[in-house]
Swiss-Prot record:
The modification Phosphotyrosine is found at Y36. The keyword Transferase applies. Keywords: ATP-binding, Kinase, Nucleotide-binding, Phosphoprotein, Serine/threonine-protein kinase, Transferase. GO terms for molecular function: ATP binding; cyclin-dependent protein serine/threonine kinase activity; protein serine kinase activity; RNA polymerase II CTD heptapeptide repeat kinase activity. The gene is CDKC-2. Residues 25-325 form the Protein kinase domain. Residues 336-513 are annotated as: Disordered. GO terms for biological process: positive regulation of transcription elongation by RNA polymerase II. This is Cyclin-dependent kinase C-2. The modification Phosphoserine is found at S191. It catalyses: L-seryl-[protein] + ATP = O-phospho-L-seryl-[protein] + ADP + H(+); L-threonyl-[protein] + ATP = O-phospho-L-threonyl-[protein] + ADP + H(+); [DNA-directed RNA polymerase] + ATP = phospho-[DNA-directed RNA polymerase] + ADP + H(+). Residues 457-478, 485-494 have a biased composition (Gly residues).
Amino acid sequence: MAVAAPGQLNLDESPSWGSRSVDCFEKLEQIGEGTYGQVYMAKETETNEIVALKKIRMDNEREGFPITAIREIKILKKLHHQNVIQLKEIVTSPGPERDEQGKPIEGNKYKGSIYMVFEYMDHDLTGLADRPGMRFTVPQIKCYMRQLLTGLHYCHVNQVLHRDIKGSNLLIDNEGNLKLADFGLARSFSSDHNGNLTNRVITLWYRPPELLLGSTRYGPAVDMWSVGCIFAELLNGKPILTGKNEPEQLSKIFELCGTPDELIWPGVTKMPWYNNFKPQRPMKRRVKESFKHFDQHALDLLEKMLTLDPSQRISAKDALDAEYFWTDPLPCDPKSLPKYEASHEFQTKKKRQQQRQAEEAAKRQKLQHPPPHSRLPPIQNPGQPHQIRPGQPMHNAPPVAAGPSHHYAKPRGPGGPNRYPQGGNQGGYNPNRGGQGGGYGSGPYPQQGRGPPPYPGGGMGGAGGPRGGGGSGYGVGGPNYQQGGPYGASGPGRGPNYNQGGSRNQQQYGNWQ
């Protein structure tokens, strides 16, 4: 298979389509699971190469191959860049898949399965950040952010919107390379068409205000809002906009970024859901006040990323030229970063769940079998006064029957205290101020919740709770977005007309424009 040079589109060649069987791979461990299937770490039996197998779930598809998988494959075969995940090939299972007992898996009795084969990455950003005691240094944060922006700039130049930027979709290997993954919600766009796009994209905590207000014409600026949320999360040590539903998410955005009006965001009052969500009272912008402990250059860049008006939001190209990346401490060389044990969000969630179950079982055991000298109150019948003979001790009173154990909700919160203190320059790497070439996340999407019915059709189901949790960065755990309506190319917004201006950028991004 021909491979395009870095930064160039490869439109003529496609990955191997079903020419090999999944039996060529040995599944080693599940690293993701979600709405669209499972992701496994696997080994190619002939070469011993470690890869990631993303199984495309077919049992719920009545009309053939899932549209999200088709879209992801078509886009990934075009994109070849060191900061974008590589789709290596497509493989199939020849017959119905079977469980460990050899029985056909329910819903797959008469079908085979299709797998997408990706390069394996050791971590996703959320799984890595959630490791106990993890503390990112400032040069490390700059290194990750520069790679994220470089990969996203490449996508936007080639007219691709990612539309699901979040920590679990940013994959990192043990060489420090970061890659964009999960293009299941990605779309091609064109600046000269004003087609309608769905606004039910991007995980809720990272969704920009224009989508929450009902816009169906948008461009690369939607991804840049998500990048701003990731940036603030890395610096702050926890997510910054944690709404439980669309109205609450917009409320949190307005509390931080101020109330939009025609002066600061022309056209906002004409957006479909503006009247449903406009705040009762005006609020001032508080980004600088809320994050005054950030470095000044970091704060300046964050302000430009979290701009309410998408037409004024900074582009990926301009963000790469921000002073933040060119002042001490400089971004470190990815290869200088420490190596960590594999950390995917699916695995860290699973470990926390197992720990909670063990603690719950220990509590239950303690209640059912108290120590021999424990002093538990005696059981009394309803309305029966407690009676005891004078001088008789109560040491051997009958134990209380154990009730049901406490219910523990699934966790999804900030990963503890600030993990990211101001650190020194660890390997201030800056040869010619060049850009760094360049990571899967996992876990189920929490339920979005429903709110009042400003949307057509009444409901307000959206792109799911906390960090979007979700499946793996290979794309298994996307939310249940409804893709209704004709989706053409995007309309207004920051178009793809990015020129490689500025001396800082001329050698940074290869030979693509």
